[in-house]
């Protein structure tokens, strides 16, 4: 059934919809299956995303028609489809009237993903009007709070030197805590890897107790504050809260040095909101493990990594992993820096829409996945600043002289970039950085030809 006479209004102007402030706008790349017209399929997509189905129903009235989602722009050649969703369509909390991301996803990436006339459809951007934006929690903490704990300026405080304890599984509590201590002697921040939790060989309570002690010892030895991101991911709300409360109690006077990691993609919006609302004084570390199943450019359905990042700021993530923008081992390229800008800036331009965040706190980009001291300068050149949390697992623990030296090499690399000094030149007077060249020779040969002669390495 062709529903374009009801669910398509190609005379609507995007600027007018934005000025009206009553619609969430979504841009998709959509292709109909063979034999289906583009506008007809787009209208069916909008109907399934809002008030319609595949037939007319007798219960529809004038009010219902007034909240139809509307296709307002199509470009069949480029496969671009844009839909305007009235804000009234989205579910609200009964406890406080707040918005919920699960409702946003149910409508914009719901039944429409399985429609028989759609070959593929993937959301590439969305715009949130002020009246709806203000209903989301947004972040309560971000990198500025980490800088405060670390004793740095809360504006432009620079890279937080971090790591992921490796191997990701198989370490018992004491070796895990020992690895934390070793890294903290040179670095700032350690995160649980996403599968680490309460395995039988590494009970959470025992591990956390030893990690808290390792933090105290590292702080005493270095005279510097240290940070730890503890995984509280669980299926059950009460389990997440129980883990969080135990961790804070165990860290005691260092509770404000603790972030909570949640696997936000696999657990969904409910888990992020549980952490955001139960622990508003903790940095909420959004890990996105599994997201590539829908966000990868190889996947033609779902939504992009940019969309995931933008949603995370609405939900209240203090920080989210954004990949390595083509400079590490993860899928991505230099253009992914727009994710960092959308997370971090007061207003930013996405692939299709300009978003003003209206004073909502920033979400911090977290950089991880195959990074080491040699790759950082290129990454910072592309991004334009170093105000990120950078977590190198192999880049720290793969250093020939151990994790302490690995952490120092990462910091020295950032210092060299900020000073505008060539990395090979800087390495001549910084041993840990010089040894990073020997630790990662394949990267060194590719990125810094001639380094062996310059550093006297055979």
Swiss-Prot record:
Pfam families: RuBisCO_large, RuBisCO_large_N. Its cofactor is Mg(2+). It comes from the Bacteria. The modification N6-carboxylysine is found at residue 191. GO terms for biological process: reductive pentose-phosphate cycle. HAMAP family: RuBisCO_L_type2. Belongs to the RuBisCO large chain family. Type II subfamily. Homodimer. The basic functional RuBisCO is composed of a large chain homodimer in a 'head-to-tail' conformation. In contrast to form I RuBisCO, the form II RuBisCO are composed solely of large subunits. RuBisCO catalyzes two reactions: the carboxylation of D-ribulose 1,5-bisphosphate, the primary event in carbon dioxide fixation, as well as the oxidative fragmentation of the pentose substrate. Both reactions occur simultaneously and in competition at the same active site. This is Ribulose bisphosphate carboxylase. It comes from Rhodobacter capsulatus.
